[in-house]
Amino acid sequence: MSTTTFTGPIKAGDVLNTTGTTAGTVKNVGFVIMAQVAPITQAGTATAASTGIVIPAYSHIVQIQMLNTVGFSGVSSNISLGTSATATELVAATSVANIGITGLTPGTDATRSALWSNVGANDVIIYALSTNTGAGVGDLVVRYIQAENA
């Protein structure tokens, strides 16, 4: 299957300008949510590693999920995510021990929440860090609105 690449950001809607006050006459254009996916292994992230996911500058992260086919195991089943080798700027250590989907969030941390709201003036690379080696295998899914804050 072939793919098409847009430089974005991409907006969609069929009423481009507001000409009235009722539905159908009020602008309804919105941003398209983008997604990037990276395979993750617990053993491969025992030392912080780049996931290969790069979020464009001024983007708004709306959701991060870990979809495990094998739950993380060992002394700790945690993973953390960030924008550097520290790998904690986006998600603090969170258990991903179960098979299936686990939602990863900034929690109640103001600094992490602000980074989700706007990644800043530069593209950011997502790093993952597991607490220890283990059997965990899955896909990291990051959904974002491209350059919403530009």
Where are these regions (language model features)?
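Surface-exposed, low-hydrophobicity beta-strand/loop segments enriched in small/polar/acidic residues
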Residues: S2-A150
